[in-house]
Amino acid sequence: MDWKIRYAQQYQNLKELITLLETEDTEKFISLTESEALTLHAMMMTSMPYFILMKPNTLEIINKIWTYRSENDSNICFTLDAGANVHVLFPKSEKEQVYEFIKSELVAYCQNGHYICDRIGFGAKPLPI
C-alpha cells in the first residue's frame, strides 16, 4: 500500500473514531479499531522490505477475544502497537468479567504471564515549577 494512501486512510479513520466515541456507536468503534490495527500490520507485511511483527501468541489472543466477544455479547475489542503487543479495550462496565477472561484465557499467551492493566486518565496537566 502506498504510504500516501495509508496516511489518508488513517486520517479518515481517526476522524471517524472520534465521531464514533462522541456518538457512543460501540459496534462501529470496535470494527474500525480492529480494522485499523490489522491494516497497519498488513501494510508492514506487504512492504519492501517486509516485516512480520506479530507473533503466534498475538494471533491466539486476537482469536480468543473474537470468540469471547461473540459468546458473551461483550464489547471487548483490541488494537495493536507496531509490535506483537495486543491492547485489550473494553467498557468500564465489563471490567470484572474481562479481567477474569484475561486471567483465565489470555495470560497463558503473555510473555512470562505478564500483562499491564491500564485505564483512561484525565489528560495532561501542567506541573508547578
Which residues does each predicted region cover?
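C-terminal nucleotide
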Residues: 1-129
